[in-house]
């Protein structure tokens, strides 16, 4: 899979959700709420430059950070994971980090 293919899959999933919520009428309209890519490489720097279309190879480390920004609801949602690409898929390096709203709110209240 390439980084471009990964981003296209993400756009389809986010568009479907936005259509179900009545935010957009067709997939092509997702750019109103999703204005960046889903991923970039990590390793050399904090935010490595990723060239679209580069095949994801075992040993690569990338982010998984789809984000939706819904101005009319005054909300932005973007939760990141870091992934190690393996021969058979990926290993979620950030699996132990809290992500559920209740967990985040409890942590912030400390």
Locate each region found by the language model.
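Active-site neighborhoods and metal-handling regions in enzymes and metal-associated proteins
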Residues: 1-110
């Amino acid at each position: 899979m390439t980084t471009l293919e990964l981003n296209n899959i993400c756009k389809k999933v986010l568009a479907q959700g936005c259509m179900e919520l009545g935010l957009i009428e067709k997939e092509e309209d997702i750019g109103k709420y999703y204005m960046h890519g889903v991923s970039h490489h990590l390793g050399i720097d904090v935010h490595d430059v990723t060239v679209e279309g580069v095949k994801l190879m075992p040993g690569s480390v990338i982010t998984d950070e789809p984000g939706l920004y819904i101005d009319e609801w005054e909300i932005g949602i973007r939760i990141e994971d870091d992934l190690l690409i393996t021969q058979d898929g990926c290993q979620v390096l950030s699996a132990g980090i809290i992500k559920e709203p209740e967990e985040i709110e409890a942590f912030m209240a400390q």
